[in-house]
């Protein structure tokens, strides 16, 4: 800029740098503010500051004409995608709706099916295949194009059964080698390994027009 403009900078350039500088200082202050709210058990402070790092920009928002972005308090999301095309905004909504349920199930073999952030079926059985089939039986029509979330490491027999239905995303606490080989035959199917994902009790923020 200095060379290009004979030792000076444009107003547009200075405004851009100001935006970067104030964003960084505000981000730092927000972390401190939220920390003190937390240790003082202030659940609903008079002013709430939201902060996060830009993680990803999905192709579009809830609808094709809308934009969206994914932010996280961490430098990356603790969500490991191991196969398939890019996650969409709606995929993220469905994934966390499914995980909210599956991560809260007992440590038995549980399966959750979600479509448009609504549960279509939930089941706990003695083996993986029974668990999935029981969850699917709750609403087999709505399950088409939905998301399956399992609280166990997936094996071959369930993978073969899942491949019979069109699904957007499959989530599990890991996949064995044979299950991965089978599921990866569908190049667009998104596979999520949620083994290390820990769910905590959190406040949920809902936007209404420009309000929260």
Region roles according to the model:
Residues 1-44:
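N-terminal beta-alpha lobe that positions the nucleotide/phosphoryl donor
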């Amino acid at each position: 800029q200095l060379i290009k403009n004979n030792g000076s900078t444009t107003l547009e350039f200075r405004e851009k740098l100001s935006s970067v500088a104030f964003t960084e200082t505000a981000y730092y202050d927000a972390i401190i503010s939220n920390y003190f709210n937390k240790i003082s058990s202030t659940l609903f402070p008079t002013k709430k500051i939201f902060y996060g790092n830009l993680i990803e920009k999905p192709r579009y928002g809830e609808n094709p004409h809308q934009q969206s972005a994914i932010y996280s308090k961490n430098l990356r999301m603790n969500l490991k995608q191991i196969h398939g095309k890019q996650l969409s905004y709606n995929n993220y909504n469905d994934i966390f709706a499914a995980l909210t349920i599956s991560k809260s199930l007992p440590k038995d073999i549980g399966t959750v099916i979600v479509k448009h952030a609504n549960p279509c079926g939930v089941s706990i059985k003695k083996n993986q295949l029974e668990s999935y089939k029981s969850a699917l039986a709750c609403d087999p029509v709505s399950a088409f194009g939905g998301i399956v979330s399992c609280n166990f490491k997936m094996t071959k027999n369930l993978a073969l059964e899942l491949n019979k239905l069109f699904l957007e995303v499959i989530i599990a606490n890991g996949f064995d080698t044979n299950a991965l080989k089978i599921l990866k035959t569908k190049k667009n199917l998104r596979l999520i390994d949620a083994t290390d994902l820990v769910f905590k009790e959190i406040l949920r923020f809902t936007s209404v027009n420009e309000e929260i």
